[in-house]
């Protein structure tokens, strides 16, 4: 959890926002996945948001579903994902690593065991996409027991009670949802609602990162202008992977260019 606090402190000192890429672990293969993640970090990613491939991802659009299918085709399992995570942490000791995943994978070997594994490999936060806040108590308790930040989604229509709960129980960062629906770069994120960011700040919530539909530098600038601490981009990055599966060198060149441009937009 401290890695997020350190990151936001360093970025504030430099007057920068955070740019956080999302990819599926093991897509398109475990070895290439590690190359991709190294490339994202070298190009300026401030933190990582990583998915563990799941067969029935309710919140994901086709781009991220296809990434899971590629990982499955390469034989990726949750166990292999944890090996990849351990390797990332060994190489990159300070970058915050977040998981974005589904409850079934957490339940599989018991909630406590899951968070224990996360702690062992150096994961900082876990967001469970299909667990609403009101059902999150056992997950947050296990997360905090193992020093993992429980991350909550703040939807665009959040009422005051939910904002207070998220502020009170969330750690690390707050996932500010651009809009309802599924992930996808073609579904442009609406600008974050300033009043949500203001309220979250008033209630001392963890810094807000805006996600869903963030695919160009202007959207990163707009997120920061509305008071968010940064932006998360997933589908746009996964699309670059998808289009270049057969040409890995070109893939890494395009990923570097994309992340460099998105990160540049976080500098005022």
UniProtKB/Swiss-Prot annotation:
EC supergroup of this enzyme: lyase
One cellular component (GO) term of this entry: cytosol
GO molecular function: tryptophan synthase activity
Gene3D superfamilies assigned to the protein according to its UniProt record, in alphabetical order: Aldolase class I (3.20.20.70)
Source domain of life: Bacteria
One BP annotation, GO: L-tryptophan biosynthetic process
This protein's pathway: Amino-acid biosynthesis; L-tryptophan biosynthesis; L-tryptophan from chorismate: step 5/5
Entry coiled-coil feature ranges: none
Lyase recorded as keyword: yes
E.C. numbers: 4.2.1.20
Catalytic-site annotation from UniProt: 49 (proton acceptor), 60 (proton acceptor)
InterPro entries: Aldolase_TIM, RibuloseP-bd_barrel, Trp_synthase_alpha_AS, Trp_synthase_suA
Swiss-Prot/TrEMBL catalytic activity: (1S,2R)-1-C-(indol-3-yl)glycerol 3-phosphate + L-serine = D-glyceraldehyde 3-phosphate + L-tryptophan + H2O
Keywords: Amino-acid biosynthesis, Aromatic amino acid biosynthesis, Lyase, Tryptophan biosynthesis
Complexes and interactors: Tetramer of two alpha and two beta chains.
HAMAP family in alphabetical order: Trp_synth_alpha
Role: The alpha subunit is responsible for the aldol cleavage of indoleglycerol phosphate to indole and glyceraldehyde 3-phosphate.
Similarity comment text for this entry: Belongs to the TrpA family.
Protein name as catalogued: Tryptophan synthase alpha chain
Organism expressing this protein natively: Yersinia pestis
Gene it is expressed from: trpA
